[in-house]
Amino acid sequence: MKEQSERLTIGTFSAASFLNDLGSDMIFPVWPLFVTSVLGADMAILGLIEGLGDALVSLSQAGSGYLSDRIGQRKIFIWTGYTFASLSRVGYALSQVWQHLIPFKILDRSGKFRGAPRDAIIADISTDKNRGRNFGLLRAMDNLGAVCGIVACIFLFNYLGWTYNRIFLLASVPSLISALLVLMLIKERKVGAIYKGLSLKDLSGNLKLFLFLSAVFAFGAFSYSFLLVYAREFGFETGFVPLLYLAFTAVASVMSLPFGKLADKFGRRAIVVLSYSLFGLMCLGFIFVQSFEGVVALFVLYGLYRAAADPVQRAFVSELAPTRYRASILGAFQLIVGLCALPASLIAGILWETVEKSAPFLFSLSLTILAIVLMGFVKES
């Protein structure tokens, strides 16, 4: 019975993630083009909006992680987060200038507070032998939904001639279904009010170091939007740009579960180092790339990085964290990464506008190398 309940929980979260990303990625392939070409924002403004969104993701997850542990409830944060995502896309469809996007971006990204409580549930019902697989499966379903969303976007945009606004409205529906699935199928397991607070002395030196180096890496991990705009300015037609987004998302979808299994077999630290190395190689490639084929290959490399980094980092943090603080520390991890993401995308946009297109990649490469060096001092727990 317990095993059946755990399978239902993982299956429900996987289905909800699939549907939510289906909606999200009907928007993402054309989002930077919508913001810059239709609403008239420049690259610095795009970087500010993207960085603000990433920072809000982390702030919301840190808060929800703490509250989830404090009140002993997870489910309410999860279904509410999916509802926020649905409502925000209606707002995007109604926006007439880039300034209108900001409140709806805040609503959208603050809805990510579902992440830490959901990850805590998954970590709690998993074992050391299947934790990487479970997180990898969740990420694989995320990415599979993204692939389907991108295909839908390409079909609606390129072949049916749908406007951005109609696509955004349709994209609101899957996340609403995700909220209903969680409401109906996830049974709240009372975890109790676990603790009164969390301080640095509760964290091991190992965990503190990993959080620090994650911040270093995140400071250079700019938004995917820069890659899409780079491709357009490199010479790819506007209608082809979503296909590049599809390429890296499909790779991430296919490879997330294998990377999760590799992490179970060879350790989380090795796969985190591999993911950072893949990102560094991608940055190096964008500095020197001179062919269309090379750009496509670098998007594939970015997909491999996403497949390795996203699930394995969360699994690694959940193992380094004391069990009673797990949701809070997962939220704190997202907070640190997101607060660094705001200046990361903003700095990348400023470097792009004031220096040259290769400058953001060189900046990110330097920080990636530093993070890899620091990772050598983190011990597998």
Name every feature range the model reports, one short phrase each.
Residues 2-57, 207-244:
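Helix-loop boundary and gating motifs at the non-cytosolic
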Residues 76-90, 172, 270-285, 365:
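Structural signature of the two symmetry-related core transmembrane helices
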Residues 172-192, 371-379:
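C-terminal membrane-cytosol helix-exit motif in multi-pass small-molecule transporters
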